[in-house]
Amino acid sequence: MVVNAKDSTVPTMEDFKELHNLVTHHIESFDYMTLKGLDVMFNRIKPVSVYDPNTENELSIWLENPLVFAPQKESFKSTSRKEPLLPFECRQAKISYTGTFMADVCFKYNDGVVVRDKFDFGQFPIMLMSKLCSLKGADCRKLLKCKESTSEMGGYFILNGIERVFRCVIAPKRNHPTSMIRNSFRDRKEGYSSKAVVTRCVRDDQSSVTVKLYYLRNGSARVGFWIVGREYLLPVGLVLKALTNSCDEEIYESLNCCYSEHYGRGDGAIGTQLVRERAKIILDEVRDLGLFTREQCRKHLGQHFQPVLDGVKKESLSIVAEAVLRDYLFVHLDNDHDKFNLLIFIIQKLYSLVDQTSLPDNPDSLQNQEILVPGHVITIYLKEKLEEWLRKCKSLLKDELDNTNSKFSFESLADVKKLINKNPPRSIGTSIETLLKTGALKTQSGLDLQQRAGYTVQAERLNFLRFLSFFRAVHRGASFAGLRTTTVRKLLPESWGFLCPVHTPDGTPCGLLNHMTRTSRITSQFDSKGNIRDFLKIRKSVVDVLTGAGMVPSLPKLVRAGPPKVIHVLLDGQVVGTLSSNLVTKVVSYIRRLKVEAPSVIPEDLEVGYVPTSMGGSYPGLYLASCPARFIRPVKNISIPSDNIELIGPFEQVFMEISCPDGGNGGRNNSSLATHEEIHPTGMISVVANLTPWSDHNQSPRNMYQCQMAKQTMAYSTQALQFRADQKIYHLQTPQSPVVRTKTYTTYSIDENPTGTNAIVAVLAHTGFDMEDAMILNKSSVERGMCHGQIYQTENIDLSDQNSRFDSGSKSFRRSTNKAEHFRIDADGLPSVGQKLYPDEPYCSIYDEVTNKTRHMKRKGTDPVIVDFVSVDMKSKKHPQRANIRFRHARNPIIGDKFSSRHGQKGVCSQLWPDIDMPFNGVTGMRPDLIINPHAFPSRMTIAMLLESIAAKGGSLHGKFVDATPFRDAVKKTNGEEESKSSLLVDDLGSMLKEKGFNHYGTETLYSGYLGVELKCEIFMGPVYYQRLRHMVSDKFQVRSTGQVDQLTHQPIKGRKRGGGIRFGEMERDSLLAHGASYLLHDRLHTSSDHHIADVCSLCGSLLTSSVVNVQQKKLIQEIGKLPPGRTPKKVTCYSCKTSKGMETVAMPYVFRYLAAELASMNIKMTLQLSDREGVTD
C-alpha cells in the first residue's frame, strides 16, 4: 500500500478490510462456536444415570453452561491481576495460545435438587482475531504495540509457538438428497442394486448422520444409517408406517402421486407405471411381518434396537423406537410428519433414477458440496469427547458400586466428585489441542466424516502469499489422493466463480487442492451486521413468503400431486409444500427481488435453486438453502432496474442465465435473455492468480506455475520480523513494488509484503551461459544489493526439558571459567548479538549445579552465521530457563540460485557477469540487470511478460504505475466512458514509449561490452518484476569424497546433514551403460562405493564358508637393521572342503556378500565359478 507523505505513516484498518474478508469464514465459525455453538451442543448431550440397587437411588449427571475464557498469563501471585496473553509472547516462548474452558457438571439424586459444580476442562485453543483474542478490535497502532503486523488478519491457532491453520475440507451438501450410482451399493447384501439416494443430515449442533435409501432389484427399498460403527438397514415401508398414523392407502397415494396418465416423459413426468407396483411391494413387506399399525411398527423397531442403544434398557419398546427415529433418521428435522414427507420425496427421486426419468447427481460437483469450517469440526469433536467423558464417569461409578470392599458412599456427593476426578476433565482441552497440532481425529464413531487425518497444516510464512493461500485453500479430502481415477480431480463447470481454475498445484494434489476465487465466500451463522442468525425465524419468514406467493403447504391428509403439474419446494431439507409449475418462475423472480432489497425478510445469501422439469434431466424441484458452510459469490441482477448485487450459490448457478461483461449474449436466443451478469471477469480466479499481470495473454500452464512459484518466493514475509521466533524465515532485503500491477495489489494491500524486484531484463543470446532457461545476472547489480536476502533460523533451548524430576532447576545459563571462550559467550552464558559464529563453535553455555560441569551447545551446519537476536524467558525461576537464539544466514545471489518472473519463466543464475562486459545502450547508458535467452518465449507463449516489459518501461519514464488487470478488452467501460477501445493494448503501451523517444515496440540498440561495437540486431529490453525463489544452492549443494558408510551394506550413507553422498540411481547407471563407459561405471558402483576383498573357495564356489587359521611364525634368525618384524601370514581355509588349496581372493561389492548371507538364511546356496583372465576354470 502506497502512503502519501501528508498521510499518517500508520495505515488504518479500513485499508485492510478486503484482506480481512478473505479469512472471515474461519473466524466467524470459531466465534459462533464460543458464543452459541457450545450451548447448543451441550443441550444435545444426553445425561448419564447411575443406579444403586442397594439404596435404590439414581444419580443423574449432565453438563451445562460452557464458558471459554480469553487467554491470560500465568500468575504466580494469588493477589495479582491476570494480564492478557499476547500472541507474540506465545510464539517466542513456544507455548500455546489458549484460554480456560469451564463448564457446570450437574448432579441430581432421583427427583431432588440439582447441584452444580464448576469443572476445569483444560486449556482451549483460541483462534487469533476471534472475539476471545486479545487482538480483537485493535487498530493498526495497537497491533504495532502488540508486536504484530498492521495487516494481521488472524484465522489461525498458535500451538507450542507454531502457527497452524484449519484446512477447509469438502463435504457433501447438508440436508440435500443426492442420487448416485455406485457399484459398492450392490455389495451390501444379496438383491441390492447400484442405485441409492444419500442425504447427509446435520443437526443444529453441526453433528451429522448420513441416511441412505438403497434400491432393491425386486422394486423395494431399504433405509440405512450407521450406529456405533455398524450400518442398520430397515424396510422403507416399516419406517413410513412408524413415522405417522397413515393407512396403507394414504402411503400408496403418496408414493404414486408422481405418476399421472395425463403426462408423458416428454412433458417432464418423473414417474412411471412401475411406481404403483413398487408401492405395493413396499406395503406387502410390512404386511408380511404382521405389522398393521404405527404402534406395532414402533414396537418392532424397539425390539431390534433396544440391545443396540445405550441407556434404554428400562424404557418401553415404543420409546426406544422413538429414540431411533429421532436420533438417526433425518436428524435435521424435529417433526415426524416432516420426516415422512422427506422420505416420500426421496423414494420418488430414487424411483425416478431407476426408471431413467432423471439423471444421477454428481457427488464430485461443487453443486452438491459444502465446506467443513473449523468451528463446526471442533464442535462435533468436542461433543464426542464430552460424551466419552460422561460415559467414563458412569463406568467409574458402576465399578465402585460393584466393589464390595470399597468405602465409597454413593449418597455422598463429595465421594462422587472425588471419584470423577480420577477421570481428569482437563484431558478434554488436551484432546482439542492435539487435534489442532496433528490434524488427526481420534474417534471411534468417525463423526460421519470422510477422513480422520489431515485437518490442520502448519501455516508457513515463507512469504505472505503462501500464508494467505492456506486460508483460501479447499481440499477435496485425503481419502481421494490414493484413488486411481481422475474423476474427482476434473475441473467441472459448476465450480465457475467459486474455485479458481488456475490456482492448483501440479503433481499429486492437482485438482484435489483448490483455492477459492477472489469474490467467493462461505456463509456462516452471522448476518452482514455481525448478529447471530435465528434460522427458525428465517425459515418461518421464507415459508410465509412462499405461501403468500401461491405455495400449497405440506399438511397431513392433504391430496398430493407431483411433477410436472406441481413441483416440490424444499427449504434446508424440509419439504415445505408444492408450487404449480406455472407459478414457479414468477415466485423465483419475486424471491430474488426480495433478496436484494435492504430491509428484507429474506436473507441476502438464501440459495434459490430452481430445477425445471425436463426430459431425463435433473430431478425437478425448488431447493432453498439458508444454512451455513455454503459457497456464495456476488453477481449483478440486471432483471431489476437498480442493478443490485445478489449473492448466489453453486447449486442455483447451474440453472441461471448469467452473462459475462463482454456485452454479448453468449449464444442465447431472445426467449432466454440473461437475468444476471458477472461483476468482473477476474472474479473467477483467486487472489494469487489475480496478481499475474495480463494473465489472459499467457498460456494457462504458465499461470498455474506462477501461482506455485509466487508461494515459493523469498520475500518480505512479515513486518514483525524482529519479534518472531520461527524455526526458519526467508527475508528479502531489498524488495520493491512492481511498476506493472493489477488492481488486486491495491485492493488487498499486497505492497505491505512485497515479493520481488524490478530488474532491467534484456532478451539476448549474449553468451553460451543463457541456454536452457539459465540467466545471467549483472555482477555489479548484485553487489549493490539486488535480490539480497537472509535466512533466519531460531534455536530454542529449554532447560526445563533437560532437567530430570529429581534435580529440577539445577541447570542454568552460565559461562565457563575457561577464558579462551569468553570472547564467544557472554557472562550470562549466551552469545552476544551481532557475533559471527563458524561451524562447531560454541554459542551457548549450560552449567549443571549437580555435577558442577559446564556443557556447550555448538553451532551445526557448514556456513558461518550472525547472531541476530537473543531472548530469554524468566518466568518464576531465579535464572532463565528458556532462551531463543536467532541466527542470520546471508543469502546473496550466487550461481545456481533460482529466479522467476511473474509469468512462470523460471531459471537459474548461470553467471555473475561483470558490469563492464554487459551490453549497453549508447544513448542512455542503460545496462541490463539480467539477460535471458529469447528461446524462452516461443514455446511458452508468455506474451504478458513482453507486455510487462514495454509497460514497465513506459511507466518508469512517466513516473506512474501501469494497470495490468487481465481481460481489459472484455470489460465494459462505465462512468460514461466508451465501451471498448479500438486500439490494441500494445499500441497503447507503445505510445507511452514514443512520447519519451523510445522505440514503439520496446527494442533498443545496444553496444557490445567487449568490443564497443553496435550489435547487429535490436534488443528487446525493459523492466520486469522478478522473484527470487527459495531454492538456493547454499541450502542444497551436496558433495563428499569420503565419509560415513552404512554399517549393514558398507555403502555411503544418504542425507546432506549427515555428510552423505548423492544417490547414483538407475537413470545414472543407464546413461553410463548407453555411453559404454564401463570403467567409469565400475568406479562409481564398486570402487568408490562398497569395494570389498572376499575369500572364495574355488572348489565348492562358496563365499560364506571361509575362515582364518592362525599360523605360528618362526623366530627370525637375524634381524635386518632396526626394521620391525613382518606381519604374520594368514591362512584361509574352507570349512566345507576342509582345505585351503582352492582359496582365492576376489574383489566384489560388499552388498553382494550381504545378498549371499540373506539368501543363505532362506536355505538358498549361492555358488561362484572362478576363472583366470584367459577364461580357464580352476
Curated annotation (Swiss-Prot):
- GO molecular-function annotation terms? DNA binding; DNA-directed RNA polymerase activity; ribonucleoside binding; zinc ion binding
Q: Which branch of life, at top level?
A: Eukaryota
Q: Where are the transmembrane segments?
A: none
Give the chief site where it resides: nucleus
Enzyme Commission number(s) from the entry: 2.7.7.6
The UniProt keyword set, sorted, is: DNA-directed RNA polymerase, Metal-binding, Nucleotidyltransferase, Nucleus, Ribosome biogenesis, Transcription, Transferase, Zinc, Zinc-finger
Span of zinc fingers (C4-type): 1097-1137
Q: Which reaction does it catalyse?
A: RNA(n) + a ribonucleoside 5'-triphosphate = RNA(n+1) + diphosphate
Q: Does the keyword Metal-binding apply?
A: yes
| One matching Pfam family | RNA_pol_Rpb2_2
The family database entries (InterPro entries) matched by this protein are listed as:
DNA-dir_RNA_pol_su2, DNA-dir_RNAP_su2_dom, DNA-dir_RNAP_su2_hyb_sf, RNA_pol_bsu_CS, RNA_pol_bsu_protrusion, RNA_pol_Rpb2_2, RNA_pol_Rpb2_2_sf, RNA_pol_Rpb2_3
What results from gene inactivation? Defect in seed production due to female gametophyte developmental arrest.
> Biological process GO terms, please?
DNA-templated transcription; megagametogenesis; ribosome biogenesis
- Which locations, inside or outside the cell, does it occupy? Nucleus
One term under GO cellular component = nucleus
What Gene3D superfamilies does this protein's entry cite?
2.40.50.150, 3.90.1070.20, 3.90.1100.10, DNA-directed RNA polymerase, subunit 2, domain 6 (2.40.270.10), RNA polymerase alpha subunit dimerisation domain (3.90.1800.10), RNA polymerase Rpb2, domain 2 (3.90.1110.10)
Family, as annotated: Belongs to the RNA polymerase beta chain family.
Q: What does this protein do?
A: DNA-dependent RNA polymerase catalyzes the transcription of DNA into RNA using the four ribonucleoside triphosphates as substrates. Second largest core component of RNA polymerase I which synthesizes ribosomal RNA precursors. Proposed to contribute to the polymerase catalytic activity and forms the polymerase active center together with the largest subunit. Pol I is composed of mobile elements and NRPA2 is part of the core element with the central large cleft and probably a clamp element that moves to open and close the cleft.
Describe its assembly.
Answer: Component of the RNA polymerase I (Pol I) complex consisting of at least 13 subunits.
What is the protein name given in its UniProt record? DNA-directed RNA polymerase I subunit 2
Q: Which organism is it from?
A: Arabidopsis thaliana (Mouse-ear cress)
Q: Which gene encodes it?
A: NRPA2
